[in-house]
C-alpha cells in the first residue's frame, strides 16, 4: 500500500504528525510542494530479497491550480488543431458545444491566415464571407443549416463571364436589354426592264474606233445555235439564239432574243441594233438562204466562222452587261 508523506515543511523526525497521508497540502510560502511516495509492491517479484529491501521511494510534485489550467488549455488547443487539420475530410469532434465554442477561434485563425477568404469546413472550397457556419452553399444546403447568406445563388454562366471580361478589357459598357441595335440596311437593286437598253454607235463618228481597230460596221457570216432561256422573275421559257464572231482580232459573243413577229420588229431594225452580229442577207432570219436544221440556224455560204475553231474558253454563264441574268443554258 502506497503512502504519501509531505516534504513541504522542515524537520525529519519520526513523529506521527510527519508520517500522515497528505493529498492536498500546498506550501504556505507559495512555493512548489513535493510528496514522498513509498510503493511496497514494486519489488514483489524481486526474488529472495529481504523485507527491508522491498519497496521503493519516489518523489512526486504536487501540481497547483495554474498548472492544471495550463494543461487544460494545451489539451483544448491540441483538439482545435486536430479539428482544423481534419476539417477538409469531414472529420471532427462529435460534441456540438465544442464546435460552437471553437468557431470563433477558427474564424480568427482563418481570417488572419490569408486574404483569400475563409474555406469551407466540410469540402475545403471557398465559403461565403458572411456565413456564420463557415461553409459553402452546397454544404449548408446539404446539412440543412439555416444560413441567410445562401438564399440566392451567385453562380454565373461561363459564357456571360467571358462576355463581361471582354467588355471590361475593351472598355465598352454593357448594352442595355432595351437598347436598339442598329441594323445594316439592305442594298436595293432596282429591277431592270425586260427590254434591253442599247446605244448604237453612229457610223460617221469614228473617234476611238481606230485605236482598237474596230470598224463601225461589219458584215460576216455566223452560226446561230438555238437555246431555251428563262428569266428570274418569270419561269416561262423562251427560245433564243446565241453566236460568236471574230471582229478585229477579238471574239464577240451574244444572245439574240425573240422580239416578236418580223413585221413588228422590222421597223425597229430587228436584231441589228445589238451590235453583236451585224450580218448581211445571209444572217437575216427573213433571207431565203438561211436554213434551220434541228434547232441550229446556219448560213448556206461556205465562208463562215466556226466558234469551236476560235479556242475561246466556254463562259460560266451567258450573263452580259446591260441584259437580264439568265440561268445556264439547257438543251
Curated annotation (Swiss-Prot):
Residue range(s) of DNA binding per entry: 120-147
Residues at which Zn(2+) 2 binds: 120, 136, 140, 147
Keyword Protein biosynthesis in record: no
Main location as per UniProt: nucleus
Motif annotated as Required for homo- and heterodimerization, chain positions: 247-250
Cysteine pairs bridged by disulfides in the record: none
Disruption phenotype: High gibberellin (GA) levels associated with dwarfism, short hypocotyl, narrow leaves, reduced apical dominance, and late flowering, but more flowers.
Annotated Zn(2+) 1 binding sites: 120, 123, 131, 136
Name by which UniProt lists this protein: Protein SHORT INTERNODES
Source species: Arabidopsis thaliana
